[in-house]
């Protein structure tokens, strides 16, 4: 985006209810007829990179954004009607409740569009949504008007009206805090009493006789099954709250035919669920507090270690309350947990046992973390990595993640809009992969679009250039390119291939920090270098952490790759090169663990194969789309 261009705060649209597979390119095709677009961003999960189901489309002109809102709202993209509204960055407007109404008892057939069409007669609508789950509409929704007056008109006219033969309730939106406060106030003045655990021989008359002494009752009912047999619970509704409270105080816990009877305030289902959830969360928090700092996570366990052996190894450090090796199908999963009675004992065990060799493997010992803590830690690590990302040297690090937004250069309204070219149509020269498939002929600058990241598939990345004439966006493929070093792990390469590989390896491997002046340019002339011998994994000394740490950083991944490639080649001969390149992105400590643990390696390889297959399927689908023709402005 051109930083000098004027900003239009109301030229940004929120696009919701998106299908998981909708990309920036699809949204550009959809919205570009409305006017010049500055940027498009599909919001994604920070870790998995999966779509969160909504996006932002930033137009150059507010009039174009308004045109898109008026003409494209609820249009179908990949089988789902999308919901469009103005992007409101200030949350205070959304949370204030001004102009927001609540509608319930809706017919299942009423969707977002039908609700919008019904209420748009009362004023300008900012957002409109029917709440749905996997089974469809949940029977209620919300409409947010631009003004409070429009909301009040809608409440006056529509409350109690029939929509699709159902009488709907329309009222002012109330926050959860307001609803809970009202619920608490009503609970203090209850008149309906719930009774259970009184046996099978109870009927309405006996229950009325039992509770009638506390005051006049409006209704008494024992719940029965289809055969008329008591279900063991019932309800008594009193006229006054004082009578109901007295019945609860005196009858709760009273012995009835050898059973302790329960008498309490009758609750709605949502109240019971809320209370049970609160109790569960409290129990969970108590358990977390009790085990905070005393529960240890132990991984890289030898297959022969069981619960008793694990307890025996950690027993010298204190009192163990539990020791468990996680199993699957009768076999160890390679990790377990040890819980001590005090944090001091656990800390001592971590200090002494982390890195110690037990049986045949060095243990990894650390304080156990909850899933939420691990996710927060991973998110923090990811953000730190992203913050340190600079313009990459393609020879050194070809796996940099792409930007998650789709930016268009600012285009003057008088000019025609540039044509859109789908990903893959314009060839991009990229270095060849470091780990090529067996027998492939390497070339230092061949077009290699096959290697991708081992995470979820990334969206295509768009960048633009600004020539003097008509501006045409240049599309860069989201496929990742692999490393340029082309050493193969199979048979000895041909002379030409070996020469090409040697020439690329001879290029100095430098990384530059951002802002460094007079950066040295890479010498593109092939330099004379001695041909490296073929790597033979069999008979090599096992790679250890100390050996890896002693090696220069640029050689560490090569040492790991030399040992990973033959193992992966035995599983997937045709994909070994790509999979090796994908796995080399993982931390070195994890790669060492995979070399020692065949199960862990196979699990990661299976994940990589799944990613490759998903990527190939998406590529094939894209080719089919491209074959139908390229849309132009």
Swiss-Prot record:
Annotated Pfam families: MLLE (PF00658), RRM_1 (PF00076)
Location(s) in or outside the cell: Cytoplasm
GO biological process per UniProt: mRNA processing; mRNA stabilization; negative regulation of nuclear-transcribed mRNA poly(A) tail shortening; positive regulation of nuclear-transcribed mRNA catabolic process, deadenylation-dependent decay; positive regulation of nuclear-transcribed mRNA poly(A) tail shortening; regulation of translation; regulatory ncRNA-mediated gene silencing; translation
Phosphoprotein as UniProt keyword: no
Recorded GO CC terms: cytoplasm; cytoplasmic stress granule; cytosol; nucleus; ribonucleoprotein complex
Cited Gene3D superfamilies: 3.30.70.330, c-terminal domain of poly(a) binding protein
Tissue-by-tissue expression: Detected in the adult brain, testis, lung, stomach and heart. Expressed in the epithelial and fiber cells of the lens, and in the epithelial and endothelial cells of the cornea. In the retina, present in the inner but not outer segment of the photoreceptor.
UniProt domain PABC: residue ranges: 540-617
Domain RRM: 11-89, 99-175, 191-268, 294-370
Record keywords: Cytoplasm, mRNA processing, Protein biosynthesis, Repeat, RNA-binding, Translation regulation
GO molecular function, one term: eukaryotic initiation factor 4G binding
InterPro entries: Nucleotide-bd_a/b_plait_sf, PABP-dom, PABP_1234, PABP_HYD_C, PABP_RRM1, RBD_domain_sf, RRM2_I_PABPs, RRM_dom
Family: Belongs to the polyadenylate-binding protein type-1 family.
Subunit structure: The C-terminus self-associates, interacts with dazl and interacts with the C-terminus of epabp independently of RNA. RRM 1 and RRM 2 interact with both eif4g1 and paip1, and the C-terminus also interacts with paip1. Interaction with eif4g1 is necessary for translation of mRNAs required for oocyte maturation. Interacts with the translation termination factor sup35/erf3.
Function comment: Binds the poly(A) tail of mRNA. Prevents mRNA deadenylation and confers poly(A) stability. Binds to N6-methyladenosine (m6A)-containing mRNAs. Stimulates the translation of mRNAs to which it is bound, acting, at least in part, with dazl.
Domains as described in the record: RRM4, together with the C- and N-terminal regions, is sufficient for RNA-binding. RRM 1 has no RNA-binding activity itself, but improves discrimination between poly(A) and poly(U) in combination with the other repeats.
Protein's name in the database: Polyadenylate-binding protein 1-A
